[in-house]
Amino acid sequence: MTLFVRRGRGSHPKPTRLLTGNSDSQRIMEFRNRMRDRGSPALFATQFLLLATLLLSGCSTLASRSNTGVVVSRSAQIRSSTAVVAADLLEVNRGDVIDILDSIDIPDPSDNSKRELWYRVRAHNDDRTEGWIEARNIMPDKVLENARKLAEEDKGTPAQATGQLHAGSNLRLTPDRSNNENIMMRLDSGSSFEIIGWKRVPKLKGSDSTESDTAPKAGSATAGANKGPQSDEDNPEEQETTELWYKVRLSPQNSPAPEGWIFGKQVELMVPSDIIYYRTGREFVAWRRIDDDSNDETSTKGKDVAKESRPGSWVILERSSSKEPHQLDEPDFDRIYVLGYEKHDQEHYTAYRSPDIEGYLPLRIEGRGSDKTFSIRIKDDSGKITDAKYSLYRDDRGVMRVAAPGEVKGKRRR
């Protein structure tokens, strides 16, 4: 009989024979030990590979949770923590791309009943600076992608007008301010943009006449605060059941998001100085130059966009002013006004003024030189909305004229 003693757990020394017995049993035991010793490296390698796979899988999961974002503020600080006394680590500017690693909600220091969202981020600088930044300064890539899809849908729609914010306002993905989930970023007062369309939606119950998250400057009085109580008849705003939203196209200098929606009460239409004095009791809601350099006039140029237009010929869409509440399905405009320009005399003249119509956007101008047309959409007597194309031409005296749909052009000047 042969007895074996194992020296230590986890080690595999050769067995020590204390008593000698059957030699066959000894050889069998030694063979089993050799096979066990040879199998250990293979087992260890298998376990190592399994562990490495799990670790890599974990890293991949963490990487998939992170995404990128774009800085929307003019400038912002990446900080060492979310604390008020945290150190500033790095300044980032509008358009900078950063990695979003994590997020956290913390109590608002100025109001504990509210919470602020912060992102843990990594900058794309040489040091790959990591820290914390307020979420309002960042537009996640998913939001930006949705804004780009919106712009792609409207890429063929020309600018209908230009506008400018007279107060800071939110740029939203949809025309809805019942919640904050669709807010893409905050636009500064004075931001300018192209207006490519608008829409009326039901008015929020109990909503103010301004954007819900627009606060007045400290120490300033609220508009109408010193006025006495007004009845619904004295204040038409109280009778409104709808609110107006503008779909706008923005330049990269103002927003990484190329398109979005802005609450109408924050927008001032920037009617070009060349035509502003030709309003005759109706609002100008859309305008396009007829001249060949019209593309220069429809681009967003900044705060003074309305002051930079040169004299020329225009197609203008007008809407009658009314004290009646607006309706959801009301037309965009009710009259077409074509303003010609005589270069020799440097004077404007009325080339065409349509009868009252129920017209809808968009306004499009096609052609070059004197051979041009413009098109809109009109509701006919049956209630159907159809395309309508108007032709521009010059008569024997060189005066611009307009042939409405179905009319024959007059003789052109050669």
Give the predicted meaning of each segment.
Residues 61-66, 112-163, 210, 214-305, ...:
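Boundary regions of SH3-family modules and the immediately adjacent low-complexity/disordered segments
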Residues 66-88:
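Post-signal peptide N-terminal segment of mature Sec-exported envelope proteins
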Residues 82-87, 173-181:
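Short alpha-helix capping/helix-loop boundary micro-motifs
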Residues 312-329, 371-380:
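Short beta-strand elements that form the blades of beta-propeller/WD-repeat-like
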Residues 56-58:
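C-terminal motif of bacterial Sec signal peptides marking the signal peptidase cleavage site
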Residues 88-110, 179-240:
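Conserved beta-strand/loop element in small beta-rich adapter and peptidoglycan-binding domains
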Residues 1-41:
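N-terminal secretory signal peptides that target proteins for export/translocation
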Residues 336, 346-414:
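Hydrophilic extracytoplasmic domains
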